[in-house]
Amino acid sequence: MKDELESIDAAGAVLLWRASEYYPERRAQIDDTPACITARGNLHLLTQPMIAIVGARNASINAQRHVHNIASELGKHGYIIVSGMACGIDAEAHCRALDTGTIGVIAGGIDIVCRPENADLFEEVASRGLLLAEMPPATKPTPKHFSIRNRVIASLAVGVVVAEAAHRSGSLITAREAATRGSDVMAVPGSLLDPRSDGCKQLIHHGATLLQNEADVIECVSRQPAVRIPPEQFEWTDSMRQTIDQTAVGRCAKN
């Protein structure tokens, strides 16, 4: 434990215990979450309402444009943007929220840059936002760690926006976990001809809120009381569960 704490300190990070002032409140209410999480950056962001934006690595231009607008609008309304530090949708969401607040959840250790092409973004989020990691320092991510990362994202946010996701996207894990926790699940429908949107269409078919523009997101998360999708109404079929869970041992590592 001493070595781990020294590594955390060397990375410019801190260890947040469940009893800590800054330990995320929504996460603290979940019984099976670990007692601590590593953080590097502006801890105050953890006290603000958060919305997750997730989606495809190989995102379409239209999806990136939607994310640009959604992240910007949510920032203006005081929401912190949470995403997974991957390429594509994640990177776009983080970039557009640097000025208003963004949290990047890492699949590996707090000192591990998963994708070299995101090294600059990694440091930008650390200095202007916040990085979180559930794994110990020096942990290089494996496929199962990406599944864990997606669950962490879902545990932080009051709502999840899936901007673009294929049939077997790891983003569907985030959506499933959010629905299980009673959070808003929202999805951009995308083109009927683009397989990168097939996962979003599934989510909408099974009860997620259809998003046509950024105003729809604000309306959805601003309802008093907030309208959530109860897990029992989020009708996952056995085939959907099997497909989504397979990402943890397959393509999830690419997300």
Language model features: what each stretch is:
Residues M1-D3:
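Helix-hairpin-helix
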Residues E6-N255:
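Glycine-biased, small-residue-rich flexible motifs in mid-sequence functional cores and linkers
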